[in-house]
UniProtKB/Swiss-Prot annotation:
GO terms for molecular function: monocarboxylic acid transmembrane transporter activity; symporter activity. Belongs to the major facilitator superfamily. Monocarboxylate porter (TC 2.A.1.13) family. The chain crosses the membrane at residues 17-37, 60-80, 88-108, 110-129, 144-164, 175-195, 300-320, 338-358, 373-393, 395-415, 426-446, 459-479. Residues 38-59, 109, 165-174, 321-337, 394, 447-458 are extracellular. Keywords: Cell membrane, Membrane, Symport, Transmembrane, Transmembrane helix, Transport. It is found in: Cell membrane. This is Monocarboxylate transporter 5.
């Protein structure tokens, strides 16, 4: 028998405000404490080169593992959410990040740091970031771009974290700085408590039928669709006791905008199945939804994943190597840290403006996204011309503005393109493939430096990846026509 525990306030439409702004605050803090500290790895990069006398390629693996796991662990995060719930998953992620930084303070080698500063914070970041992103999409629709931009602007606060990190390293050495980073990340435990579950009532109720379960869906584009989940032997979730008594079975309706909640923690934990057999059926249904092969038949999945993969690969190369390149040009490391600060300020402002403009719906969001990617590519191809501090600052300003513009639109563009697919599965699988590329990005850039003894090749590589990442969005109209021809 199905029972619902706890009282969840039902709504007939997405809030676009209210408690949703508390979710944005949590998402903002995730970007400040986790993503912001990830970006300050550029400063630790130089310190580790001196401390462990490693090559750029070897040390690049630390940042590469940290960055890629945030994406690669996407499917794992969805499974953990299904088991523990979104709030608990986020709290677990905060503890993992904290533990990673604390253990890293005892590091004696680069391989040790690859595990403690690469794997653990990367895995914890995946838990924190994906949960916050998915919950945000549940609370916002019309203001999704703006709310996401405000949340992601926290990443831009590296303009405070960069000099602060350098100050901590000078004052307490790199070991003390990592201990303090762990303490700071622990603040995400109470902020994760803000992740209150939400349930959106479906306007067109449709029950689970005898031949497979049919879920009423209202996607991001407000098109009514149906997701059919064929369970083992096409069986349905029924109250076995009620059925034997000859009473009608109960229907369960889930709106598509919140359909992932059915197999995510908040709703899953309120559904208690008394029969082990029925529990197995629901678990099987969840796994099939999580690894839904229908995504591989969706052209929009390929369009988004291609762009997401290459843009994330390109983004972390200049981020990690900017300070190191400034040092090779004879610029003092403290002055170089100001480059990161300026980039953080402008990226923050750019994200908020980009999100607000996109929410006006003057043109489709992916057009803005595509334009920013092209501009990022051109900027990085011109980066080797910046050989003095003023020119390097000019490059930093341009790149921060354009990067902030496209970063603010990743989640809104995903929601627009995923259509009938739930955000959790679409984002998780796309992130997995993107993470595989991000894993190789910084080491490749480091190898290029070790081979050429200049960072020019790294920035050329980043620029080419940005230009290639924009190509897939030119196929969106073609994919839309193909989709329309099937209906």
């Amino acid at each position: 028998m199905l029972k619902r525990e706890g009282k969840v306030q039902p709504y007939t439409k997405t809030l676009d405000g209210g408690w949703g702004w508390m979710i944005v605050i949590h998402f903002f803090l995730v970007n400040v404490f986790v993503m912001g500290m990830t970006k300050t790895f550029a400063i630790f990069f130089v310190v580790f080169q001196e401390e462990f006398e490693g090559t750029s390629e070897q040390i690049g693996w630390i940042g590469s593992i940290m960055s890629s796991l945030r994406f690669c662990a996407g499917p794992l995060v969805a499974i953990i959410c299904d088991i523990l719930g979104e709030k608990t998953t986020s709290i677990l992620g905060a503890f993992v990040v904290t533990g990673g930084y604390l253990i890293s303070s005892w590091a004696t080698s680069i391989p040790f740091l690859c595990v403690t500063m690469g794997l653990l914070p990367g895995l914890g970041s995946a838990f924190l970031y994906q949960v916050a992103a998915v919950v945000t999409t549940k609370y916002f629709k019309k203001r999704l771009a703006l709310s996401t931009a405000i949340a992601r602007s926290g990443m831009g606060l590296t303009f405070l974290l960069a000099p602060f990190t350098k100050f901590l390293i000078d004052l307490y050495d790199w070991t003390g700085a990592l201990i303090l980073f762990g303490a700071i990340a622990l603040n995400l435990v109470p902020s994760s408590m803000l992740l209150r579950p939400i349930h959106i009532k479906s306007e067109n109720n449709s029950g689970i039928k005898d031949k497979g379960s049919s879920l009423s869906a209202h996607g991001p584009e407000a098109h009514a669709t149906e997701t059919h989940c064929h369970e083992t032997e096409e069986s349905t979730i029924k109250d076995s006791t009620t059925q034997k008594a000859g009473l009608p079975s109960k229907n369960l309706t889930v709106s598509q905008n919140q359909s992932e909640e059915f197999y995510n923690g908040p709703n899953r934990n309120r559904l208690l199945l008394k029969s082990d057999e029925e529990s197995d059926k629901v678990i099987s249904w969840s796994c099939k939804q999580l690894f839904d092969i229908s995504l591989f038949r969706n052209p929009f999945f390929y369009i988004f994943t291609w762009s997401f993969l290459l843009s994330q690969l390109a983004y972390f190369i200049p981020t990690f190597h900017l300070v190191a390149r400034a040092k090779t040009l004879g610029i003092d490391i403290m002055d170089a840290s100001y480059l990161v600060s300026v980039a953080g300020i402008l990226e923050t402002v750019s994200q908020i403006i980009s999100g607000w403009v996109a929410d006006q719906n003057w043109i489709k969001k992916y057009h803005y996204h595509k334009s920013y990617l092209i501009l990022c590519g051109i900027t990085n191809l011109l980066a080797p011309l910046a050989t003095t501090f003023p020119l390097l600052m000019t490059y930093t300003i341009c790149f921060a503005i354009f990067a902030g513009g496209y970063l603010a639109l990743i989640l809104p563009v995903l929601v627009d393109l995923c259509r009938n697919s739930t955000v959790n599965r679409f984002l998780g699988l796309a992130s997995f493939f993107a993470g595989m590329a991000v894993l190789s990005g910084p080491p490749i850039a480091g190898w290029l430096y070790d081979y050429t003894q200049t960072y020019n090749g790294s920035f050329y590589f980043s620029g080419i990846c940005y230009l290639l990442s924009s190509v897939s969005f030119f196929f969106v109209p073609l994919a839309e026509r193909w989709k329309n021809s099937l209906t």
